[in-house]
């Protein structure tokens, strides 16, 4: 099964970029797509029109989508729910996004897969040391996420994906991966998943695909970065699809 996670960026030419993203997804061989920062239901509808190959969509909320989380799937989604993270730390605009985790059960040809799509709070200091104020916020969110993963039936495989806003080598993330019994599909990869800019020429990998095997099975994966190049919009302008790259994984279940 082929899975993608991507932060779609909530600002700047949003409808045009989402149409271009949807068209690219519709042409792809991806089976499950997990997006973050899709803030409005009208944008989820736009994606669905642009990518009709994905017959099944999971998102929560009316006008404003909870957590900005959307899952597109070629396979049936039997159930899904959104769980909001605890509100901690200073008052900040990001709280309006109601960040949390979306848990969905997808009926793949290989059997049921639990997909957890999430977007953690941003670290505005770019300091991921354990004592940083934003690291403490992330620790609370990760604790809630770990409890959600622990509650998933161990007979089911799990993929935890999204913009975790934590570098791969950060103690908060590595401790969470160990505590939750997960493995990082891109372990050891040093490439950034946030697009480098003159103001931030060497960003870290903030977007991750983490997996847990079902009891008695093995879930393995390989991954790569996608959607790194500019695209041409209908009016002729060139733009990137997002300020993040997509992370695509090929997951395989075996006994």
List each language-model region with its residue ranges.
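N-terminal, active-site-proximal structural segment of metallo-dependent hydrolase catalytic domains
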Residues: 1-50, 61, 142-143, 243, ...
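His/acidic metal-ligating clusters that form di-metal
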Residues: 103-116, 134-161
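Catalytic metal-binding/acid-base residues of hydrolase active sites
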Residues: 9, 39, 76, 119-121, ...
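Metal-dependent phosphoester-hydrolase catalytic domains
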Residues: 150-159, 166-255
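Active-site environment of divalent metal-dependent phosphoester hydrolases
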Residues: 11-13, 39-43, 64-66, 123-126, ...
